[in-house]
Amino acid sequence: MLDSTPTAILCFDFDGTLVDNPSDPYEIAQLEQILTHMGKRGAVWGINTGRTLFHTLDGLKQHGFRLTPDFIIARECEVYHPNEYRRWVDLGDWNSRCAHDHKKFYKAHSAFFKQLQKHLASHWPGAKFISDQTEPAGLVVPDDDIMAGICHWIDSQLPGWPGLGYQRNSIWLRFTHQGYHKGSALQEVRRLLAIGPEFTFAAGDNFNDLSMLRHDVAHGLACPANAVPEVSQHVDSLGGYLSQEDATLGMV
């Protein structure tokens, strides 16, 4: 990814943090100016998102970005970087380990997913369990209150299912191996670049960002004004920066 060790890592969630919907082209230009300035000082920047890699690249184009990130963490756990031919490829062997562990994870927790579907049918009929090639196990629900109730039930089941983890973002939830999330993926990027948490910045706005908004991952923490209350409170409790502006402008 780089010819020399960077001076710092800047890592942003995408939707709701780095970009708004719709985005303001002037705000994007301001952000790119700052990222360019930081790049000249040796920093690298990347996106840490629940989107797939290709959906993220489409999003960058849609929101008018001219800068290319130094790395992208997709689906909250897959790590990519542009090679010398500007093609996006795996960064190290993390993705192969991630795929291997998740294949075992979904098989080992198939009984839990069946139990969950029965529970949803009897308690939250509006919730939908998702299972396909793109998303082996996930949920979409009508509103945040229902999601909170379901997450409370899932949390009560965790002691009986070692390795069970999930990534919650608004009305969407993705089940994952407990060892793979935005925080652990960013730590892997740090390890490969030989950068400590004291030179790492992370910003996010939703529940799935909490795993990277920790001091063992990044000492510089921030969230935009549109962050969910739980994230704002968490960042504030760790002495992080709570922007008074939403999304892109909050990162400028």
Predicted feature residues:
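A generic structural motif
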Residues: 40-44, 162-164, 218
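Conserved acidic, metal-coordinating active-site core of Asp-based
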Residues: 113-201, 207-215
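Active-site metal-binding loops of divalent metal-dependent hydrolases
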Residues: 18, 77, 204-206
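Asp-based phosphoryl-transfer active-site loop
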Residues: 3-24, 213
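Active-site phosphate-binding/coordination module
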Residues: 29-122
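The start of beta-strands in P-loop NTPase/AAA+ ATPase cores
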Residues: 8-10, 70, 200
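Short glycine-/acidic-enriched loop or helix-start segments at secondary-structure transitions
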Residues: 21-22, 56-58, 83-84, 212, ...
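Mg2+-dependent phosphoryl-transfer enzymes with acidic/Ser/Thr/Gly-rich catalytic loops
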Residues: 5, 176, 183-252
